[in-house]
Amino acid sequence: MKNTLLTMVLFAAASAVCGQNHTVSASSDDTDGFPLVDHTTCPIMISKDDGKTVNKVAQLFAGDIERVTGRVPRVVTSTKPKCKYMVVIGTIQGNDYLKKLGEAGKIDVHAIDNAWERYVVKVVENPSKGVEKALVIAGSDRRGAAYGTFAVSEAIGVSPWYWWADVPVEKKEKLMLKADMISKSPSVKYRGIFINDEDWGLKPWASRNFEKELGDIGPRTYAKVCELILRLKGNMLAPAMHSCTGAFYTHDKSKLVADTFGIIITTSHCEPLLLNNASKLEWDQNKDGDWNYATNKDAIIAKWEKRLGEASCFENIYTTAMRGLHDAGLRGNMPMNERVPLIERVIADQRAMLQRHKDIPAEQIPQIFVPYKETMDIYENGLKVPDDITLVWVDDNYGYMKRVSNPEEQKRKGGSGVYYHLSYLGAPHDYLWLNTTAPVLMYEELKKAYDTGADKYWLLNVGDIKPMELGMTTFMDFAWDFDSFDTKTINTHQAKMLARIFGQKYHSDFQYLLDRHYQLAWSRKPEFMGWEREWDKPEYTGLKDTEYSFDNYNEAQQRLAGYKQISDLAADIATDLKEPLRASFFEMVEYPVKAEYQMNRKFLMAQLNHALQGKGDFAGANWAASQAKEAYDSIATLTKEYNSILNGKWDGMMKLAPGWCALYQKMPKVTVNPNTVEKPADLSCDNKKNWLDSCFVVDLRNYSKISNDAQQSIRLVDGIGYDWHVVQLG
């Protein structure tokens, strides 16, 4: 068996489009390919013994074929196929037909037997009597079968983001496939997302739009979430857990939905043993008492026992230890020498409960400990964490890893993992609005963790999922096959993704646009342009002028020009795209780029208003004020458009967060002088101001030679830093 990439050759039967000035035609001469759809559609055969996940995946695959061709294949459970061509989807343990193919040497099941989430995809000649060809998708387990199936879905043109980002599917009348592939095991065992801070996006969208009958994020929403995770080759979900949302387990069907898709449920660092204490439905202090293990242990244990009784029969990863309510510190004003033994006792009690409910040794149950905020202090003050529990290291909330495993920790049986943020709510400032974490930064920081053994558990905080499509895809691709990336390839990953969706002719435009998008946000995210801190002392709160200067080094002018350039580029591409692609492009590219330009324009023009007013240039000040107000209104217009596209499919998703945590969304104060005609200010760049006096700048990209030896290395890395090119040592 060749260990090659899956290759699919697609042909569209010749057809004429009546009433238009062109025809659509392509060769259909391939006689070697597997006819997934030709004059008829191939049935999809599964085994009734393979369980609900394989059945769900087969039904989704049938839906994918319908999206491409308009034809719906049958999903059957017959053990004696009576057709010339068929698709077989299943696991090698649960599908006797696949077992027999393996025994006959027609597929290499030994390569994936007893492996984690691997698959074989192969066109098999004469697999059984009366069958001429079969497209065989055999998984080592239920998720392996799913990943193999969705690899075929992507090859025929169905994006994992077909629903969540409205990526259109190109129609074909005929699908001829070639396939011969054995997958590797994923780089990271558990890979998934945490839906967080959903108050101003996913929750209002689900409650008032997608799941109105429930009025909450419930099983219908989670079905779409789980499907997306599976299509992105993930396997794990930490559900939404803010108090505005009904806790995951309060809607009985949600856990059944996750299990149907084969998705493992985990929880955040502050939800021990699957219990969401941020929700009053789970923990009500008026009824249940204080969330304090030292004083209210029995009530807390009773809650955990109840949760394990209803959930332990499913695949879960259990958060151990405990923090305070929601994201607060541990309750009780205890010194450190009392905190450490208390948390050790909590963990011991939790493991005893898990062992009793699961009826297997605690060492065999997936568990995590997250040293985050005050629990990091407790850990570093001597907390003894059982060796089989996975340590999950956390970034600093802004993309930089605070800690990775030391040599001793790397020897632990439980290994380590990562909890990483693309979205954050908290001090000193949130960034919930747009996706601005540079892919190279993500790669460099995750590589530090991966190289020190963090390959067990990767969880990504994605906020509301939208508009984090690009960053989420990059993270999941890392987790699936980290070694396929390096510092040279990572910065092109997202541009290539966009080019596959919207057209290769835009590839260089996408690369430039994304480079500038991330570079400009590197020095200041759009959410930080108000120059204030949140939840801080009064002197640090309230909108302020930025520190970008209009007088020195063209700082403000260049920033405005840079954002305007990519905003205009996004608009030009949108105009050039065919109509079916425009909604998806608006969601993933056009809205973020245009909105961040207007956010910068709003604050910088307000700042210019203040400066010109102080200089007595009242006409210029009035012009700057109107520019700031126009930018403010433009953000509202763009957001309204986001919520209106596709007949309001995403209505509520892009609601702006309220001022108590997002002052930057407000209009800064400006001064307007009555009876004074506006006069535009000159915002052109003066090249004489570009450089520091008496300084000489060397562009290291123009090097002629780099000398490295065994002890040290020097390399230039693109896609990171203020200049977007850095020298990396070591």
Language-model-detected regions and their locations in the chain:
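Gly/Pro-rich turn-and-neighbor structural signature
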Residues: 75-77, 168-176, 249-250, 257-260, ...
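Bacterial Sec-dependent N-terminal signal peptides
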Residues: 1-26
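Extracytoplasmic
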Residues: 669-730
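C-terminal non-catalytic alpha-helical accessory regions
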Residues: 167-172, 494-662
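The substrate-binding groove and active-site-proximal loops of carbohydrate-active enzymes
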Residues: 47, 134-139, 196-219, 235-245, ...
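Contiguous, structured surface segment used for ligand recognition
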Residues: 20-185
